[in-house]
From Swiss-Prot:
One GO MF term: shikimate 3-dehydrogenase (NADP+) activity
Gene of this entry: aroE
Protein name in the entry: Shikimate dehydrogenase (NADP(+))
Domain of life the protein comes from: Archaea
PANTHER family: BIFUNCTIONAL 3-DEHYDROQUINATE DEHYDRATASE_SHIKIMATE DEHYDROGENASE, CHLOROPLASTIC, SHIKIMATE DEHYDROGENASE
Top-level EC class as recorded in UniProt: oxidoreductase
Subunit structure: Homodimer.
UniProt xrefs under InterPro entries: Aminoacid_DH-like_N_sf, NAD(P)-bd_dom_sf, SDH_C, Shikimate_DH, Shikimate_DH-bd_N, Shikimate_DH_fam, Shikm_DH/Glu-tRNA_Rdtase
Keywords: Amino-acid biosynthesis, Aromatic amino acid biosynthesis, NADP, Oxidoreductase
Family to which the UniProt record says this protein belongs: Belongs to the shikimate dehydrogenase family.
Pfam family, one: SDH_C
Length: 272
């Protein structure tokens, strides 16, 4: 039996185990997906222990996505983004690290047949999710503006991306009025504060594509108001699904059973 898992703190409410175990069942893989909660002080021990115990691969979540860079060999995307969320072990060798959050953003748009190349995109939030989203959109050809309460953090991302990326504060009326894509990469609107929204409804407009990284609730206030404004909406579960899809494909070198993974994920969200 192969063992995969998730390292983070906390991880007790993670939706990854049912999603990945549905994939193993669908592909006839004898595997389990388990969770681990190390501390920052025991992270290196946890990574080395997983490697020594022949664990096949692990996902990494908050607060360790940056810290694990010190213990693995990152691929080019993970190195550019400065964060790892997927690790693959290789027979005791130094583990390889990947950032599938970037691919998760791209494939969420692809799933909905939405082109990114040449579009103007606004990313709200300059944390880890915002950084991955901004890099994903820029890599796919979008002109990206990062908006954040602390402008310096947004400016850092824009500088790292280079090209035409720009940055500013949270007053994004002008940027969103000209934008084709809006992506919320903050936790604003997440349960139990689902009455909140990161962007005033008056900023939203027909022709805009709005992706909210928040997936509890599935339909956030931002998405409801975007629909009312005539925008196209994508819920955050699609990002979660596709980062898991890409992780599965890295680990197993098989095509992921996307339908079964999506069904398991959304069943868990309905029960949450």
């Amino acid at each position: 039996m192969d063992i995969y898992g998730l390292i983070g703190n906390p991880v007790e409410h993670s939706l990854s185990p049912p999603m990945h175990e549905a994939a193993y069942d669908a592909r006839g893989i004898d595997a389990r997906y388990v969770t681990f909660e190390p501390t920052k002080d025991t992270l290196e021990t946890a990574i080395n222990g997983a490697n020594a115990l022949d664990i096949a691969g692990i996902n990494v979540t908050i607060p360790f996505k940056q810290d694990v860079l010190n213990h693995i060999i990152p691929d080019d995307i993970a190195r550019e983004v400065g964060a790892v969320n997927t690790i693959k072990f290789h027979d005791g060798e130094t583990p390889r690290g990947y950032n599938t959050d970037v691919a998760g953003v791209k494939r969420a748009f692809q799933h909905h047949n939405i082109s990114i190349d040449g579009y103007d995109a606004v990313v709200v939030g300059a944390g880890g999710a915002g950084r991955a989203a901004a890099f994903a959109l820029a890599d796919a050809g979008a002109h990206v503006h990062i908006a954040n309460r602390t402008v310096e953090r947004a400016e850092t991302i824009a500088t790292d991306i280079g090209g035409q990326a720009t940055a500013g504060g949270l007053d994004t009326r002008d940027e969103i009025s000209d934008a084709d894509i809006l992506l919320n990469a903050t936790s604003v609107g997440m349960d139990p504060d689902s009455n909140q929204t990161p962007v005033p409804q008056s900023y939203l407009h027909d022709g805009l594509v709005v992706l909210d990284a928040v997936y509890t609730p599935i339909e956030t206030r931002l998405l409801r108001e975007a629909t009312a404004a005539g925008a196209t909406t994508i819920d955050g579960a699609w990002m979660l699904l596709y980062q898991g899809v890409v992780a599965f494909e890295i680990w197993t070198e098989q095509d992921a059973p996307i339908q079964q993974m999506n069904a398991a994920l959304r069943a868990e969200l309905e029960d949450a």
